[in-house]
Amino acid sequence: MTARKKPSPTLTTLTVVVLTVVAWWIFLGRDVVRDVDPATGNVTGPYGAPQVIACVLVLAALVVVGTLSAPTWAAVLAVAVPFTAAWTIQAQATDDSGLWAVGALLVLLGTLAGGTVVAAVTRVVERRRAARSTTAP
């Protein structure tokens, strides 16, 4: 049985960066309309829970893919930085209050924290699988 060759860490990282921006665009980037409840006047959005959950799941999968073939820090940053940048560009263009900067910081911290947890779990699972495969008869 031949060992699988790992893909280039640089190519993987660049692919994760591009797919992160694509995920942002598909799930969040095109939705800029806030919803107003006609009965109460409450304003919500622009994002709904299902689209945010789907985006988070895709970002987590991208961190896993990146972690399996690139340094952990590169995988986390390859998701957190471009996602935050894409979110920030849109938020800055549509926000007159200046609160986009606070939102950008929170998005960055959230994606860094979430990405770090996903990468850590991925590394633990990867090590356990490697240990099992070397001790298997």
Feature roles, as predicted:
Residues P9-T13, A75, L99, G103, ...:
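Residue-level signature of transmembrane alpha-helical entry/exit and packing/kink sites
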Residues P50-T72:
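Canonical alpha-helical transmembrane segments
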Residues P9-W25:
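Alpha-helical transmembrane segments
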Residues V22-A54, A85-L109:
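Membrane interfacial helix motifs at helix-loop boundaries and amphipathic/re-entrant anchors
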Residues A74-A85:
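Central hydrophobic cores of alpha-helical transmembrane segments
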Residues D96-A130, A136:
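Alpha-helical membrane-associated segments of multi-pass integral membrane proteins
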Residues M1-K6:
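Short, Lys/Arg-rich, polar N-terminal cytosolic tail immediately upstream
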Residues L28, G66, Q90, V118-E126:
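Membrane-water interface at transmembrane helix exits
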